């Protein structure tokens, strides 16, 4: 249920690429950083990583134990965590709920499995935190430490908020609520609201990492208002710039730059839904013919035919596929569904189109939540991610559903562009602990 990666290998490859580009382009002055949000690595007092990367896909916060208790709960709340003991917090047994549900009930906070502090709570309760660990940060924060020789992490608010237990209005961690869950403030990394200078690497200024959602928005939309960024990768995501803080079920107000927010909604399956369908078709073809080849080109043709067929149907005769195959952040137990299935639409063409339409509709419903709560109107749509770049029919569906023209982002690696921009506009004053 945990989703882990080799943090040292990731950083080694990133540093090798950095060296390659610095050798090739001699005029580089600044290095901006970004990477996957939510996940964490543990750091020791010398600034060295002492754990794998626990990614955003970690599902342990949704687990229940066999005896019906919260799976985040220890039988003995005073088990040793490294060399220390939890000696001030008495954790009550809670019957039949997951750690996520326990947090919601006890702290009145909505968070999600895979968020860094949820992972940390689970690890703490199961004695999984390395004895030498003193704090944690994102993988890109750790890269910044390795490049500059920092011994303590500095986390931009765009990443700090992705850990959960974060007050986006006050731009600080919810320390009292963390205490209720047994987390001491000493674990929390230092945070910054501006993109601060971390230090230098090969005479280049290295700046604090920003979240990949914020970097993608900055690299494709910039600071434009009324422009919706639709990203379709493994997951799906919408983001739009706001001067005001707004949150509701499924919508987060993520700290951006210049005290603004990105109102964001994310689907857990997204482009993965289309990949699941391709794998389904591919398995059948392999059994029938012995051939095992990608079928995306064929599926594109089928999607076009399915779209044409769907346009001729009455609304109550149109195939509807809910692509929540991995649940949602609000309802992780939710599954997908197929409705309005009739003999004339029980076809590969309708299923292919139906999955694409379902992927888009899940994001559109999130936008409706934003619009109803803020009156923000979408006038332009910027598309990013291979799910859109490689699927003309999906682009057409998004345009028709959202009622605006979709323009693909100029640069394919939008987050990398955004990271570079963040480095160029950052406050070069070094943070106090650099």
Predicted regions and their residues:
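A conserved helix-loop-beta module that forms one wall/lid of the active-site cleft
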Residues: 178-196
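Short loop/turn motifs at secondary-structure junctions
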Residues: 27, 184-187, 360, 377
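Active-site core segments that coordinate phosphate-bearing ligands/cofactors
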Residues: 62, 71-110, 117-152, 164-175, ...
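N-terminal phosphate-binding loop and adjacent alpha-helix
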Residues: 1-27, 64-68
